[in-house]
Structure formats: structure tokens, C-alpha cells
């Protein structure tokens, strides 16, 4: 999936499936919208690209699935950087970009034919703790609420969560590629957690922040 909320250059490679996220109530982009079929498109201001993932989970079936963004793609050609970022996606140089993405996609296929189950971004290592980074950039009470919710729903995760919150390792960008079984398991785990966080946050009357569940899912 390529999650996009605006008109932008998109690759023509058939491995990529652009989807208009947050399409509900917006002008069409000429792409399939996350407001069709079984959807949560209205939650996009809070859930970000997750509304596209939810749409895919409920409305399509494929052997492998992944998520990238209209300004960021996995890059399997360079060893120094795992991403093709928006600064390099020059609409005036689409021929070279298409060629790069095509070769990169061929390398991607080799990963799965070699037996890999999932591909993730390279981990980032923070100078401050996992919790400290969230406190610096967001509202720490929301991260604590998320951790408590996971502990209550899945008690076996408690030790791991404690280690992660105190650690310095994180996977940013909400990007991955995996087989459908892993994807289905992940979605079946993630969305009940987010639903419960949303319910608890409402009951506790905690302040509202846009994109909250996108930020939390990146940590989950």
C-alpha cells in the first residue's frame, strides 16, 4: 500500500497499490479510498495511515502486504539507507525514480523467495529513553495509558513492555512488508488495543491530540 492524502507523484510499479487515506468527506484523488467497504476512514485525523491498513485488512486478501507512504519508500539497493525519501522523489525526474523503484522491487521479491517473513525499517537508537523521547515530543500520559492497556489485555507482555519503555531502541515510520498471516495477526492484536485506549481515554477525560493513535501504533 502507498498511503497518501494528497495528489502527488506515485510509481506505476504493479507491486504498489496507492490508497487515498482519510478520503471520507474529501475531494477524490482518482484512487481507491479508505472510505469504501468496511472502513474507519472518519478516524484518519487520529489514526493516520492506519485507516488504510484497516481498509486493506477488511477488504482485500493477498499473500504479502506492506505499507509505505507517498513520500517514503523502502529502498533495497543501498546499504547505507533503507529509505527512498521525499527529497529524492523529484517529479521532474520520474523516469530515473521509476527505474530505481523497479530494481529495488525485484530485490524485494528475492527476500520473500528466500524465506523471509517480514521486513521492517532499520531500528533507530535514541540518546534518551523510549519513554523520554515520547515525553519530549508528545504527551507521556498517553504512552502510559497504552502500556497499561496492553498489560491488562495481554499480561504476558508486561516484562517486555517494561524493558522497551526503559530502552533506547525504536522502529519509526509505521512501515513494514510481511506475509498475510503475520499481517492478520498484527491487525487482530493492534486494533482492539487502540479501541480500548480510545475508550479509556474518553472515560478519563484526557486531553485530545491529533494523530495520537498513529503515534502510539508506531510504538506498539
Write out the residue ranges for each language-model feature.
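ER/Golgi luminal nucleotide-sugar-dependent glycosyltransferases, focusing on the catalytic module
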Residues: 1-220
